[in-house]
């Protein structure tokens, strides 16, 4: 029962539950309007989100939902941030030298969609939290679904009146001496990559890692190969200290980007990012960016591959993140000739479905054009008359590039 436990004890129990659930890292962030969220507003206003309109979702008052948790979860007092290591012992996909094969981002090699893997574990942490603070006889509804539906149950415990005291700079730190006698409502909501919040900001303030110049969260021991999951809660837990920035003067990630997607340290223009172009971008890819895409067909890890903090990154122990056969360096002709049925069967349960069949085929013919392998020309000439006009246009470009190289 929560009244018998100090806030710090509940916080420790949550972190222990996260470790038991399989998370390598867990921390607590307070709910505040951090400066980084103001930067997010400016990033959106500058058009750097590209066509990712879900980033621009607004509430009834016209405010960006992701810019402040107070907009979508006014009851939230703490954010539990959990992280899983997805790095494997396999070489980088771009180290595959066969020109007939493409490159896929490391996170998409897995045997199971990471959203499901992380959410399953978040639910275990959420359940442990409820078990610790629910009064006898008051059982909460089943754990949060992937859509992030909030679950609530009344309880007497941590937070109380203090959870409601919010000054201009956000919630006040929880006090171990505090004991609440008035009943409050425990509310939780789980999110994995799809919720209306900027998870990386809260990961920083939960001490998970610092925001690198490549905009990824970097942990001193694990590097940047991390999947993040968050649990919003109405309980005011003991927050961790934000992780210090350890990038120093290094600019390797910025210098290595083949499409110059970084407009400065910590500033990414999605419109030029290979991950965005191969996954989120619909329709045609600007010609001036195609050559820089190399043989990437889904995502890009270059800015992480070159990061010194990833040189000795630990390999994951989670079997779900081991590569599926053929996913590390898939044959380009196989991808380009894939039928709708093949696509559905091959990528069932994979994040690669996000690109859709047309996008993956488009990416494959661009990769053929960048392969330097003229054996692709006959196949590209065939695709130049494809019923998908986007694939056809990119195939013509690729065939011309190979013919004149």
What are these regions (language model features)?
Residues 1-8, 16, 62, 127, ...:
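Intrinsic disorder/low-complexity segments
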Residues 2-135, 184-246, 294:
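Auxiliary alpha/beta "docking" domains used to position bulky ligands
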Residues 23, 252-276, 296-320, 379:
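Iron-sulfur cluster-binding cysteine motifs and their immediate structural context
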Residues 276-294, 305-338:
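A beta-strand-loop signature enriched in Asp, Gly, Thr, and Trp
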Residues 324-358, 365:
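Alpha-helical adaptor scaffolds
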Residues 342-346, 373-384, 404-405:
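Amphipathic alpha-helical scaffolding segments comprising HEAT/armadillo-like alpha-solenoid repeats
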Residues 357, 387-389:
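Short inter-helical turns and helix N-cap capping residues of alpha-solenoid HEAT/ARM repeat scaffolds
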Residues 361-371, 393-402:
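Structural detector for internal amphipathic alpha-helices that build alpha-solenoid repeat scaffolds
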